[in-house]
Regions:
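Non-catalytic C-terminal accessory region of glycerolipid acyltransferases
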Residues: 54-194
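Catalytic core of membrane glycerolipid acyltransferases/transacylases, capturing the structured
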Residues: 1-50
Length: 194
């Protein structure tokens, strides 16, 4: 969805643990109540400053996991887009960084799937908006529309690292985790409403 899915996950994790962070776009640091939990990422990665920021975030994320903390990651680094109003929304290609981090820290993984999609106008314009301010304004607009509405999420079972250790290739591990996550869509038993 863009913002509200991250807020829901932070809220859920905070009920049982305080040692968590969420990797998200640096512009979301404006959410002051979440600032201490945000590991900022600059997805443009074009400038020296953005590269420096991303390296610092990667180091902090690795340290968090090595210390047994929880890291919330949206592996595509973006918002799922539907090709048309009748289609489901799907992620862009998943980044390989989460797979690298999993292998480096030998961490377990909990897949979570959010059911639903943003409004029609969002999907019509999402791929066309180049201006970052307009793009993030559209995320805020979608978030406001969802306040007070039901959002269904599917929470999978923890995948122990020993079960995925043999998937040495980052591509292979990423594909496996993506498949496991999208399978959750059909797992009604573990469906939660927030």
């Amino acid at each position: 969805f863009g913002i509200i899915d991250g807020l829901i996950l932070c809220s859920l994790v905070s009920e049982i643990r305080s040692d968590f962070k969420i990797m998200t776009h640096e512009t979301l640091k404006f959410l002051s109540q979440l600032d201490q939990f945000i590991l900022p990422v600059d997805f443009s990665g074009e400038t020296k400053d953005s590269k420096k920021l991303n390296i610092a975030t990667a180091i902090e994320a690795k340290k968090l996991l090595e210390n047994g903390g929880v890291l919330i990651i949206f592996p595509s680094g973006g918002v799922s887009i539907a090709k048309d109003i009748k289609s489901d929304a799907f992620d862009d290609e998943w980044k390989l960084f989460p797979a690298k981090l999993i292998h480096q820290t030998k961490t377990d993984v909990l897949p979570i799937y959010f059911d639903g999609k943003n409004g029609l106008l969002f999907h019509i314009f999402a791929s066309k908006i180049r201006n970052q301010t307009l793009k993030y304004s559209s995320y805020i607009h979608e978030t406001r529309k969802k306040i007070g509405k039901k959002i269904f999420i599917h929470i999978g079972k923890i995948i122990p690292y020993k079960n995925i250790e043999e998937l040495k290739s980052r591509h292979e591990l990423t594909d496996f985790l993506k498949e496991e996550t999208y399978k959750l869509k059909f797992n009604i038993k573990n469906k939660k409403r927030y």
